[in-house]
């Protein structure tokens, strides 16, 4: 049977651990709040950009004179799928939901006899698809070493996609990403 001193030390240790856990919880809550604010601040810009691109694409009457990027190749034989996930885990269904949707689309593309090419952005997506679809992965991008993701990283991904398009490496591109609704829900 433990002595009274041993019990006091154990109680003290548990209380100390509780204090540390509470502090970590407060830091995590502050980081989550900041991330949520940033996501909500960027939403109007992304919606406006989406509307501009859709209006531009819909306003083109003659496909022959339209820029190749908007008019497309006119075929749908080769699909480039860009899977965007996190580099770190412990975020619930964030990565799993988007990978599930992507895998369903990969199966459909392959079943239709189309050529599939995949670019992964984030290590968690690659980890989840590499067993079944690893042979289709043409490029792996990870920004794990960067503390904060900015426009430069998005531009890097965009340049890779544009370079592949100009080299006629694909006919259609599908982006798989989560749309932030709130802290609990991200829609793939």
Identify the function of each model-found stretch.
Residues 2-188:
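Conserved loop-to-helix interface motifs that mediate assembly, gating, or partner/ligand docking
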């Amino acid at each position: 049977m433990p002595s009274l001193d041993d019990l006091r030390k154990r109680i003290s240790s548990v209380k100390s651990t509780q204090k540390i856990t509470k502090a970590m919880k407060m830091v995590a809550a502050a980081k989550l709040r900041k991330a949520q604010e940033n996501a909500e601040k960027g939403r109007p810009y992304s919606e406006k950009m989406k509307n501009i691109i859709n209006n531009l694409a819909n306003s083109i009457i003659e496909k022959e004179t339209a820029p190749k990027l908007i008019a497309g190749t006119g075929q749908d034989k080769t699909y480039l799928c860009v899977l965007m996930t996190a580099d770190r885990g412990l975020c619930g269904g964030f990565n799993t939901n988007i990978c599930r949707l992507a895998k369903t689309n990969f199966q459909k593309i392959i079943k239709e006899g189309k050529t599939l090419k995949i670019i992964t952005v984030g290590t968690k997506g690659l980890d989840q698809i590499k067993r079944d679809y690893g042979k289709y992965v043409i490029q792996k991008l990870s920004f794990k070493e960067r503390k904060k993701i900015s426009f430069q990283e998005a531009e890097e991904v965009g340049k890779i996609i544009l370079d592949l398009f100009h080299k006629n490496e694909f006919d259609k591109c599908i982006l798989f990403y989560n749309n932030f609704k709130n802290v609990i829900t991200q829609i793939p």
